Amino acid sequence: MMRRFFYILVVALCLAHVVQAQDDVRRNIAIKEVTVFGQRPMKDIGVQRTRIDSAVLKENVSLSMADVLAFNSSIFVKSYGRATLSTVAFRGTSPSHTQVTWNGMKINSPMLGMTDFSMIPSYFIDDASLLHGTSSVNETGGGLGGAVRLSTKPAQADGFGLQYVQGVGSFKTFDEFLRLTYGDDHWQLSTRAVYSSSPNDYKYRNRDKKENIYDDEMNIIGSYYPTERNRSGSYKDLHLLQEIYYNTGRGDRFGLNAWYINSNRELQMLTTDYGEASDFDNRQREHTFRGVLSWDHLRSDWKLATKAGYIHTWMAYDYERDPGNGIMQTMTRSRSRINTIYAQADGEYYLDKWLFTASVTAHQHMVESRDKNIILQQGNKAVVGYDTNRMELSSSLSAKWRPSDRVGVSAVLREELFGDTFSPLIPALFVDGVISERGNIMAKASVSRNYRFPTLNDLYFLPGGNPDLKPERGWTYDVGLSFAVGCEGVYSLSGSASWFDSYVSDWILWLPTTKGFFSPRNVKDVHAYGVELQSSLDVALSPSVQLSLDGTYSWTPSRNEGEPMSPADKSVGKQLPYVPEHTATVTGRLTWRTWSLLYKWNYYSERYTMSSNDLSLSGRLPTYYMNNITLEKGFSLPWADLSLKCAINNLFDEEYLSVLSRPMPGINYEFFLGITPKWKR
């Protein structure tokens, strides 16, 4: 049915193109001017940064930031399935080593230390950038791998505006996006809403099970892998984002960003589950509010910015199972509440060839975590979890100096306080220089120290938390080259290559104990090193045809170089679990008038599921390649701009796993209709 609908849509697009030919408004083909490195911002001296194009963020309404980063960056996205937990990791580190900020406020869970990128709609993000390795120290501490910086921007509306997108996809998936805007000389207002829902019952071949084939005498004459449906995978996600900006016109801007999440997701059954879906109820619910108030005060040679924010998260996880008597029994009933108060002040001062910056950030976490099905006894007190507070302070000073247009030097000092424990001073040094103006060839180098304090679950989770854990500590070194050539309006070509070397001591790992549960320990010294490559090409093939190609590649060996914990420990010298040694992405976009064809490809090499790098069937996940393609047509009508879009995901119906025993969908389709009324035209 979906394939038939796809063919009908393609025919309809062609007919509509003929009908609308007389009103066809051609897209502007703009090849960007090559950046002159002498004009680069002083704040970016020596920084290894990847900026995600705004067009990529608005590719389609069904995408999360996990989907965007998987196809447009060199970092590893670990997904537990469609619309389930998705985390990102830089350079062979873990997801908890990736710091994530939204409009300046950290949104990593203080309990787990990581961020679920499947819960961040890409349509809610206007600016996204990745700070690799040492560069994350400019933003925050704790990013031993790097940092992801997400933010929103004023809509730049003139009067009232509206945008609506309706998406329909395979597995009865529905995605809806609505944005209302208003703007004048001083005010910019925006309201965005995204709602996504699906039974998510896709088919897959289960290679963890075998069905026997019998003859008439019940002798086994063969076997096959059964085709099953994804069970217990439905979801309903609602996101609301309200933004208000006021610009005085005299150098002051005030802002309010408020984001509400209401999510109800089933957690899919494993490929090794033999029970019926009706025998399980495995569900996670989340209500989250994030709000940020900001004030920016701008003058010709200095800037002052302050922010205040609040996060409230209520999360429930329920697991019920029928043991065989027809009555559901509760196995897990977990509840957690997180309240975070945030404050930040930043200052910048320009003095001739110098830029001085200072920043102070505070996050006060108040966390309550309970499993109401587990009761432990501490003396006469019943304990079902933990209830604790922690203050996190981070302050930094930096001096950036550009003695000439060709050379820049930056020094950063950062200090952090978690609870009542100070980190040692965290220094970072950045240097860059233009080697050749012909080709705009630039060299960059940086070195930094970094620390990451244990999460609240690491310290207090019951059972198993370890309050005696030490912070993870490390040093990271970066060296890179970049170039940019081109001719404005004709073509532009840019690329970069960087080498990184990172050492992390006291790596925290959860290990089994003789008491029957897991507990975290400082056990590893990890050496992560490798290469990151990026390239981008834009070509105007004709006045109405443009081709854009982007690619990334990373080689990231990440080895355990600690001492064996026992004679049976086979992890020393081995690649860390769920860290691919090779990743690559390619995206290509061909634009002709109001038609656009987008192709996306990504690749993850083999990943081990065990620290021993066991070569058994369950010890490793095979290499996989993913191919997606999208065709879009735009229309300009007297009353509105319209867009029709068809996306095919997993184009070649690849069988793959991102996490052991978590089924992933085969080929699937999505269709989108976008409407933007012309109220003031």
Where are these regions (language model features)?
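Gram-negative outer-membrane beta-barrel transporters
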Residues: 401-408, 498-503, 522-610
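Extracytoplasmic beta-strand/coil segments of soluble accessory domains associated
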Residues: 66-109
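Conserved C-terminal beta-signal and adjacent last beta-strands/turns
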Residues: 8-10, 21, 192, 245-250, ...
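Membrane-embedded beta-barrel scaffold of Gram-negative outer-membrane proteins
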Residues: 301-319, 368, 436, 442-444, ...
